[in-house]
Structure formats: C-alpha cells, structure tokens
Amino acid sequence: MGKEQQLYYGKHGTPQKYDPAFRGPIYNRGCTDIICCVFLFLAIVGYVAVGIIAWTHGDPRKVIYPTDSRGQFCGQKGTKNENKPFLFYFNIVKCASPLVLLEFQCPTPQICVEKCPSRYLTYLNAHASEDFEYYKQYCLPGFQKNKGVAEVLRDGDCPAVLIPSKPFAQRCFPAVHAHKGILMVGNETTYEDGLGSRKNITELVEGAKKASGILEARQLAMRIFEDYTVSWYWIIIGLIIAMVLSLLFIILLRFLAGIMVWVMIVMVILVLGYGILHCYMEYARLRGEAGSDVSLVDLGFQTDFRVYLHLRQTWVAFMIILSIVEVIIILLLIFLRKRILIAIALIKEASRAVGYVMCSLLYPLVTFFLLCLCIAYWASTAIFLSTSNEAVYKIFNETSCPVAGKTCNPETFPSSNESRLCPGAHCQFAFYGGESTYHRALLGLQIFNVFMFFWLANFVLALGQVTLAGAFASYYWAMNKPDDLPAFPLFSAFGRALRYHTGSLAFGSLLLAIVQVIRVILEYLDQRLKAAENKFAKFLMSCLKCCFWCLEKFIKFLNRNAYIMIAIYGTNFCTSARNAFFLLMRNIIRVAVLDKVTDFLFLLGKLLIVGSVGILAFFFFTHRIRIVQDTAPSLNYYWVPVVTVVIGSYLIAHGFFSVYGMCVDTLFLCFLEDLERNDGTPERPYFMSLTLKKILNKTNKRQAEA
C-alpha cells in the first residue's frame, strides 16, 4: 500500500480486513443500542397512555355536530335535538364582532332547528298574528308568550328577525345572492332588523362572510365528490393496471434488463414527445377562437379549471415545460451513456437477487399496513385530543357590561347577580376548554402525538430497509449462487432486525423524527410570519428551512447505508453509520455515478408507468376511446379521476421500485466491501457475479488459470 493510499485511507477510515470466516450477514450477533430500545418502549407505553386518556376525555361528536348555546349537539341521535340538525343564529350580524376571533363563538344565542327559515318575518309583526306558530320554532326551547315584545328581545328569548336562509355545514346562513352585481335577499337589498330600522344586506354578508367566502370552494368540493362517486371503480381499475404494469416490468427486468432499460428510455422520450405534439395541436386548434388569447394573469384564479384549457397560453406553457424536460433527459443520456451500461449490469444483478428472493416484492405491503396503523392511531388520537375539552360558558352582551366574558353556569345564571347587573346578557356556550392540568397540557400532548407519529413511521421504514438489506446481502455473499443462499432469507433478516437491532433502528429513526418535527415547526412559524414586514426574519426563516431540508436528506441517506451495514455486520448504529460513510467516501466517484445513474433509471421507470396509465386514464375519462366511449362516466371535472390515478400509480410504482432500489444499494455496498476485502486469490476470492467481474476486469485467479 503506497503512502498516498495510506493517507487516503487514514482520512476516510480503514478498509475492512479480510476475514476467512465471513460469509455474509453475521448470525452470531448481539443486541445493539439497548438504551434506545428502552427509550422506544417507554415512549410507546406513554403514547398508548396518551391515547387512552384522550379516548376517555375526547368526544369526536364535537367535530361532526354543531352545538347550540348550551353546548348541546344538533342532529345527534338519542337526544332531544335528534330531529334538529341545523344550527340557527339569532343575529348573525354579531358574528362579525371581534369577539368571534377571541372566543371562537358568535356573541348571539344559537339553537338547533329542524330546518332553516324560509320566510322573512320580524317578531314585532309575528307575535300578534297567525305567523307566531311558525316564528316560535326559532325561539328558545320552552318559550311562552308571557312577556312584552321589548322584554323578549332584551332577554334574547326570540330573534328580532327571521331571514330566508340556506344550510351550510349544518348551519343556517342568509340566502344572499347577486343580481346584476347587487347583493339581495329574496327581492330586497335591505332588510328590517326587527327593531324598527332597516339595514343594508352587506351587513349580513359581513356577518356570514366565512360562509360566503368559501361558497365557491364548497361547490368545487361537492362537484369533486360527485365525480368520485361515479368514477371510483374506474379509478380502482386504473390502479390495478398500474400494479400489473409495475409487476410485469420488474419480472421482465429480470430477464431483459438491458433491453428493458433502453426501451424504457426510448418510451419516456416518445411519451414526452407525444405530450409536446398534443400541446401544439391544442394550441393550433384554439387559434382564432373567441377568448383563447386571454393571458393567464388577466384571467386570474378560477375554480372551474376547464377554463384554463381553452387558453392558448396554457398549452404554450405545457409545451415549454415538456420541451425543457425532454432536452434535459436527452443531454443526460448523451453524457452518461457509458455509465448507463455499468448501471444496467448492476440492475441485472439486482434482478437476479430479487428473482431468488421473490417474496421481497410483497414486503412493501407489510410496510404499507404498518404505516396505515401509525397514521390511523395518530389521526384518531389527534381528534380525541382536540375534542377532549369541556364545555366552557361565558357571559355575552351586546352592550358594555363589566362581567362580559366571565365564566358562568347556564343553569344558575338567570338568578345570579351577573344577570341582574347586566340585563339582556346571556350565559352561553363559548368554546371547549378547561382549567385542569390535563387541559393545560393538551398542546404538549398534541406535539408529543406528532413526534411519536414521525418516530414510529420512520421506525417502520427503517425496519423494512434492514430486512431487505439483510436478505439481499445474503444473496451477494453466497459464493455459489443460489446454492449457498440460506433458506427464507427475508424472514431470517426480519427476525434478526427485530431481535437484535430494534434499538439501532429506534436511534436512526429518532434522529430523523427530531429533524422532521423541527421542519414542521419552521413551516408553522413561516406561515405566521408571512404577513410580517421584517425581511431579515423572512430571510432567516428561509435559510433555516433550507438547512434543515438538506439535513433531513443527508440523514436519510446516511441512515439507509447504516442500516445496510447493520444488516450485514450487526454493529450498532453509530459504528455502522461511520463505516458506511467512510466506505462511500473511499469510493465517492462510483457512488456519485453508478448509484445515482441507477436512481435515475428507476425514476424513468416510474415515469413510464405513471405516464402510460395517466394517458390511458386521460383518453378514457375524456371519452376519446371509441370502444368504451359510452362506458366512461360523465364528470364535472375529468381531471379528478385522472389526477387520482396518476398519484396512485406513482405510489404503487414507487412501492415496487423501492425494493429494487434497496437491492441495488445493498449490492453496491457489498460490492465495494468485496473489492476492499478480497483480491481474487484462491485464499481471498471475489464474491461478485461473473457479470460484474467482467465489467470491472476482475477475475478469481483460480478461475483465470482454469
């Protein structure tokens, strides 16, 4: 070993020494990072305890049903409000009060009703007429007409006026509509407030602005929901096609890796080329059509996305984007053509490994199931925590009152001193909260819930990586493949990971979870600072977000390679991470080229599958396939099922290719270890396949002599 090589190895660690007893993943190993395993166990116990406490105190009905002024649910079965699903506000104009922002509740009485008002009436006109029976259903429960008009309105027993309303999110909002740009309720632009004066409709709009502000969004959501109801089975068929294509692609890759890779590259180029041609054809077709030359800036945001497809500028933008992607891919292929040949050989070797461990293709289902459990537990715990507050009642008054905002009891309030001090004040439900230790700790429990979700989700992913790495490492280090391959390598690797390395997996996933929680906090702070004018704060926030994004990517890369070393040697996390990092640094050129070129080829495979299924879905849902033209459902937005199929296809393809990616990474690290451990002599033969030896001009001397 030369002096320069000694200095180089000293800088990036020392290579693994030759061990004649080494034949792949070590079976006689001990537990690693035990203290982290203990911490994970305690954290899970605490997480379960938090879930039990949340389920004990929580009430998801608070999310589903609106509540009246006494905190009673509207429309809930088994209660007196079972047939009253809608919440009615006595004076919705009060919802524009600043108190709404402070207390998250309108300072006006609210009751549950069977249906929203459909008539315009005032209490002044209705109390002495036959309309009173209709009006009475919008008064407080149990109201009797034994008071004067002034007393009834002062005590808030009945609303001063009924306005035609429509339900939204189980709440009654004024049925405001626009006629020639003028806001109206019914045929009127003003309304009588029931107290002898007339007010402008805009005051109602201000009070109900949250509902009117999301009216278009609600219509969009309803149309999207309708599209899902009539196209869900076709979406499932599209996802099944994506799964079959992914599986077929991987099976063919085992036997025709070289041809498939080049066919894949050509197909991606052709798909992008067709996309460019289609954009140009649409651009040419719209020439001369009325309104097609309007710019995207002038058009602004539209909830009906089909409007954008009638603009020539939209298709020009699509064509430019696709052309740039096409040129970038072609240039990369030209400059990396030699390295692609080496990557193809690595993929062929990975194909053989996957072929001998076929059950590895099903392991993503295990990861998916465990991740679903993590997500379900996190989501349910979050809902129960957010609904575990107690009903808090506050004193509300339309005029100034010294006790306004104080906590009160609705049962005893009518006879209390506060009621006599402020005539006309109401003790009504304000929000859900509490003064106990548990309620004060709710924010901390929610943060803990998020943290544990990240930790457990990363642990599940780490378990999958170690399991696959152990199985594929067993394949590589088998001298006579597949005869020396152990029985059930995947199950053996899974058992070793759980039995010996739970602590190491917990350590690696903990580091990643901490960084991810910090990124979530930074995103939250960034949203809060968007309205700020402090440019330095915005710059600092952008720098922090960028730094932690890079840190997360680096930790993911380091963890992935550390897990491979753990699967092979059974060392603890820090030792494995250090050895993997130094091994990669000693072979940085191979890492930068071979590994990344392989990742690029896998990305092209995903694009081919997603593009093929996406184009098929596009032609089907736009009724452009004549054979099934009458079978395709009629939709409000054809892009709803198309986008769903595209996203689902990508996730399915990613699941299959993730197994392949882990196989390539594992074989690559084993290959680097093989080059450093062995020299091809009869005492230290190479374990790599004949194909890899041929590419690298390496031979075992006994074979060469033969």
Curated annotation (Swiss-Prot):
Biological process annotations from GO: choline transport; ethanolamine transport; transmembrane transport
Reaction catalysis annotation: choline(out) + n H(+)(in) = choline(in) + n H(+)(out); ethanolamine(out) + n H(+)(in) = ethanolamine(in) + n H(+)(out)
Segments passing through the bilayer: 34-54, 233-253, 257-277, 316-336, 365-385, 458-480, 505-525, 564-584, 600-620, 639-659
Positions bearing Phosphothreonine: 14
Subcellular location: Cell membrane; Mitochondrion outer membrane
This protein's UniProt keywords: Antiport, Cell membrane, Glycoprotein, Membrane, Mitochondrion, Mitochondrion outer membrane, Phosphoprotein, Transmembrane, Transmembrane helix, Transport
Topological domains, Cytoplasmic: 1-33, 254-256, 337-364, 481-504, 585-599, 660-706
Membrane topology designation: Multi-pass membrane protein
GO terms of molecular function: antiporter activity; choline transmembrane transporter activity; ethanolamine transmembrane transporter activity; transmembrane transporter activity
GO annotation, cellular component aspect: membrane; mitochondrial outer membrane; plasma membrane
Database matches in InterPro entries: Choline_transptr-like
Extracellular topology ranges: 55-232, 278-315, 386-457, 526-563, 621-638
Predominant location: membrane
Glycosylation sites: 187, 200, 397, 417
Disulfide bonds: none
Modification after translation (UniProt): N-glycosylated.
Pfam families xrefs: Choline_transpo
Protein purpose: Choline/H+ antiporter, mainly in mitochodria. Also acts as a low-affinity ethanolamine/H+ antiporter, regulating the supply of extracellular ethanolamine (Etn) for the CDP-Etn pathway, redistribute intracellular Etn and balance the CDP-Cho and CDP-Etn arms of the Kennedy pathway.
Family: Belongs to the CTL (choline transporter-like) family.
The protein's assembly and partners: Interacts with COCH.
Protein name in UniProt: Choline transporter-like protein 2
The encoding gene: SLC44A2
